[in-house]
């Protein structure tokens, strides 16, 4: 009888996790069609850092690319910052891409934080990675770059801009970069971070070792706490119309921060 209960409990947990994964897939499908993120014939580069968000994006887009409509191709790239002491399991990341028959590229680059003291090292690192993705995308004939930003990232960036820039702006689902003749898309823009945390545990995504010397200086963790505080006041705060005004238009400019 105890064994039956244990088996029944495991089945309930598996069913719950599978329902959550399908829910996330539905959110991505809605984002794709509502914001015109992916069209027939697109060749999309996905940046795979090794964190739960990018692992989930490779998993989800890899599965989605096998569906008939829209028809698109996915290429996966892992950017290695040689001046930051962190370690990623490249073979594991390669296996995650190859699980969906996706090409996997490793690209090494670096940045010098002393070249522009007006910008934070986190900004310079992010921009260097982004520039590398543009170069890889061009080299592999990709017309779009998919990033693993989720709903929490978008709302936290909104709060950062309001707090530090006094401006109402954040990362849009689709961003046209005319300078590079490229589009950046965020297919997980409607997915909550807590949903991805559950999926990562269910899927068993491996955590990558990281020891970034600049991480503690980031204000994003403060914005996470601020978002939690807002939700404590109003559990529906993240779904308010004000939070979603940035999703109504497809920006062609760079967002702030």
Pin down the residues of each PLM region.
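ATP-dependent adenylation/nucleotidyltransferase module used to activate substrates
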Residues: 16-158, 164, 194-202
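Ser/Thr-centric signal marking residues that sit
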Residues: 157, 170, 245, 251-252
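Functionally engaged cysteine thiol sites
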Residues: 12, 121-128, 209-216
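Generic structural signal for well-ordered, non-membrane alpha-helical segments
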Residues: 21, 126, 216-219, 234, ...
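An accessory alpha-helical subdomain
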Residues: 226-244
């Amino acid at each position: 009888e105890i064994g039956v209960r244990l088996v029944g409990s495991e089945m309930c947990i598996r069913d719950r996790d599978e329902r959550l994964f399908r829910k996330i897939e539905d959110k991505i499908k809605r984002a794709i069609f509502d914001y015109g993120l992916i069209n027939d014939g697109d060749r999309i580069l996905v940046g795979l850092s090794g964190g739960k968000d990018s692992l989930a994006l490779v998993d989800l887009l890899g599965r989605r690319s096998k569906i008939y409509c829209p028809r698109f191709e996915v290429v996966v790239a892992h950017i290695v910052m040689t001046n930051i002491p962190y370690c990623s399991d490249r073979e594991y990341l390669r296996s995650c891409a190859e699980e969906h028959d996706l090409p996997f590229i490793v690209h090494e680059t670096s940045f010098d934080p002393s070249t522009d003291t007006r910008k934070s090292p986190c900004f310079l690192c992010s921009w260097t990675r982004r520039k590398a993705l543009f170069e890889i995308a061009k080299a592999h004939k990709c017309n779009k770059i998919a990033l693993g930003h989720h709903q929490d990232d978008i709302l936290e960036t909104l709060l950062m801009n309001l707090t530090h820039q006094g401006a109402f702006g954040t990362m849009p689902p689709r961003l046209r970069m005319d300078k590079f003749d490229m589009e950046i898309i965020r297919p997980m823009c409607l997915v909550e971070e807590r949903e991805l945390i559950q999926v990562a545990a269910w899927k068993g995504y491996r955590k990558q070792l990281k020891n970034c010397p600049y991480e503690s200086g980031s204000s994003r963790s403060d914005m996470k706490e601020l978002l939690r505080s807002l939700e404590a006041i109003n559990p529906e705060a993240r779904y308010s119309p004000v939070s979603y005004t940035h999703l109504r238009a497809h920006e062609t400019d760079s967002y702030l921060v």
